[in-house]
A protein has these predicted regions:
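Enzyme catalytic cores with a strong preference for nitrogen-chemistry domains
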Residues: 1-350, 366-375, 407
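ATP/NTP-dependent adenylation/nucleotidyl-transfer catalytic domains that generate, transfer
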Residues: 23, 161, 220, 232, ...
Length: 638
């Protein structure tokens, strides 16, 4: 349960209609199976102690007596199970019959949550047997104790501060204002839905979307367990489609028409953090609720969930293609607006033959096409210097010509050498002055050409470089519109590959594929034997690690220890723990120390959920101390 990770489960027992004794044993078997998976919150279907399809048998006192006796058996049989358990049953309260979720923990019944919305349309006749529940229905005596009854029950874990559980039943989810809305607003981070939803053609996908959507709206984990095989098939069939969703993502789903157990790991710390970040999610207000405490044994949750090593990149090929097209359009539309607003006659792009400048040129070409402007208005400038290789230079020239942009070449070596003489710098000393002088010379050239051409300079730097501060202040850091500013390096590759894969120009596609195969480098140091000598990832670390760290820090707000924990899962077999720790420390140090560069970024379009614009997503002081984060990293063990 460390870091907010909780194993949860849903299960559908094989019920025997109206045989509560048999059903109690089937339910206990499911509970034991979920316990073997270390589940700490368990959900079983609506009315599963009796079977949902008992119909007029619900009027029989014998059945109701048997149901209550069965609950006692389940409570006693689960006394050693370290979990909060929700199980469905009929319950007599104040002379009426309620359809309730019985909530148990370690053999004790903690509360009964009644169903509010009783369907009486189409195949459903629940109002024939049951009464709608309300917020506070007092207590009912069960097992010699007074047990609270009502929809206003919150079950809060004493030793996992962010684990707060509430329940609703089946139809409650399908109405315009589900009880789960108020539960979430009162602080519930986990919603249990005990359901008996019959199958019809197309209903499964709708149900899936409903559960996922509710978990997204409420920023919660939603555990949905529904009736399955064993229910009466007199008129209906129940498919047992169990679902576990978290903030819009389905983490686990059982096969329909199979009575299966679903297990997933949810992250309640992340959910509460996300709510805290959202100014439109109200502060928890639970004064109308009764809070019931329970405790769970402390143990570290085995992470039974997928952590994507490339969080910015969809793993599904079709989704990736659509996402790439969408991002390219966002970038191009942002630039289109700026071109139209400024009445610019041209756009100036410095082309190195590397990934970032390639993407910037492709986006600029698309923006010009959207405006119906000739691509000759794109002034693509190559500025070979001390570190330029034939490979990158030739690729730059070839792509400029293939795209129909205006080619311009301005070698920088002579100007930089003059600059070294002016400032009395020894050109044989390849230090930061040697490197940054080249970057600033290139920026000056681009700015002046933009003035000549009545245009503006297109920035090429990407999100990963900005996060690490891997840019020369007032050099490549500066432009007049930065189209790549919120595109991480791992995604830049996919955007360029997508453009190549879909291009009708075979020559251009070939150049783009070669750019993709070229090592990432600023090419500010002289080559060795004609090959790139300065490789960025050798200096600052693998971009796939840094992009992962960036996503987990800014999007998820995870602390260093949690990022390290999930990084080990995501990169298992690819990077050693020592390597992950080394570059995690580098990431934090660079992220904090380089904020001054991000505090004065040019405009640029946001394309994803993570961005570092000082006017938008990241309001961070340039002189913040990183010591707390570094200290935590240094306590971590490989």
């Amino acid at each position: 349960m460390k870091d907010g990770f909780i194993t949860v489960a849903t299960a559908t027992p094989q019920v025997a209609v109206a045989d509560c004794e048999a059903n109690a044993q089937a339910i206990l078997a499911c509970i034991n199976e979920m316990a073997a998976a270390h589940a700490k919150v368990m959900v079983l279907p609506e009315l599963c102690i009796t079977g949902y399809t008992c119909s007029d048998l619900f009027w029989q006192t014998k059945l109701l007596d048997e149901a209550e006796a069965a609950l006692s058996v389940i409570a006693e049989g689960s006394r050693q199970v370290d979990a909060l358990i929700a199980v469905g049953m009929p319950l007599r309260v104040a002379g009426k019959l309620l359809n309730v979720a019985a909530i148990l923990c370690r053999g004790k019944v903690l509360g009964f949550v009644p169903k509010v919305n009783l369907p009486a349309y189409n195949e459903f006749y629940e109002t024939r047997h049951f009464t709608s529940g309300s917020a506070d229905m007092g207590t009912v005596q069960f097992g010699g104790e007074e047990i609270p009854v009502g929809t206003n029950l919150l079950f809060s874990c004493e030793n996992v501060v962010d684990l707060c559980v509430a329940a609703e039943i089946c139809e409650d989810l399908w109405v315009p204002n589900p009880p789960s809305v108020q539960h979430a607003l009162a602080g519930a981070s986990v919603i249990c839905n005990l359901s008996a939803s019959d199958e019809m053609v197309g209903k499964g996908s709708y149900r899936r979307d409903l559960v996922a959507g509710q978990s997204a709206r409420l920023v919660c984990a939603y555990l949905y367990a529904t009736a399955g095989e064993g229910e009466s098939t007199t008129d209906l069939v129940f498919g047992g489609q169990n679902l576990i969703a978290e903030n819009g993502t389905v983490l686990a789903e059982s096969a329909t028409f199979e009575n299966e157990t679903n297990v997933a790991t949810i992250d309640v710390q992340r959910l509460v953090s996300e709510r805290r970040r959202m100014s439109t999610f109200p502060a928890a207000e639970s004064k109308e609720y009764r809070e019931i405490s329970f405790a769970l044994a402390e143990e570290e949750t085995k992470l039974a969930r997928f952590f994507d090593a490339d969080p910015f990149v969809p793993s599904n090929a079709d989704q990736l293609s659509d996402r790439c097209e969408e991002i390219l359009n966002i970038q191009a539309l942002g630039l289109k607006k700026r071109l139209a607003h400024t009445h610019a006659k041209s756009a100036v792009v410095g082309i190195s033959g590397g990934l970032d400048s390639t993407l910037a040129l492709l986006v600029t070409a698309r923006a010009f096409d959207m405006l119906g402007l000739p691509r000759k208005g794109i002034v693509a400038v190559t500025m070979p210097g001390f570190g330029t290789t034939d490979r990158t230079y030739n690729n730059a020239v070839a792509m400029i010509k293939s795209l129909g942009a205006t080619f311009k070449e301005v070698p920088i070596a002579k100007a930089v050498m003059q600059h070294f003489a002016d400032i009395d710098h020894d050109a044989s000393i390849h230090d930061v002055t040697y490197e940054n002088s080249q970057a600033r010379e290139r920026t000056q050239i681009l700015m002046d050409i933009a003035n000549q051409a009545n245009g503006f300079v297109i920035g090429t730097g990407d999100l990963s470089e900005l996060a690490l501060g891997w840019a020369t202040y007032n050099g490549d850091h500066m432009s007049m519109y930065a189209v790549n500013a919120s595109v991480p390096k791992t995604l830049v590759r996919h955007l360029v590959r997508h453009y190549a894969d879909t291009s009708a120009d075979e020559v251009l596609a070939g150049v783009l594929y070669d750019v993709l195969d070229t090592p990432v480098s600023p090419e500010l140091l002289p080559p060795e034997d004609g090959a790139i000598s300065q490789k960025t990832e050798d200096l600052v670390g693998p971009y796939e690690l840094h992009d992962f760290f960036l996503y987990q820090m800014l999007r998820m707000c995870f602390p260093p220890a949690k990022i390290y924990r999930v990084a080990k899962e995501a990169f298992a077999g690819r990077y050693s723990n020592e390597t992950i720790l080394k570059w995690l420390r580098t990431f934090y140090w660079r992220f904090f120390s380089q904020q001054f560069k991000r505090s004065c970024l040019p405009d640029g379009p946001k394309v994803g959920s993570v961005a570092v614009s000082p006017r938008g997503d990241l309001r961070m002081p340039s002189d913040a101390c990183v010591s707390a984060w570094i200290k935590e990293v240094e306590t971590l063990q490989p």
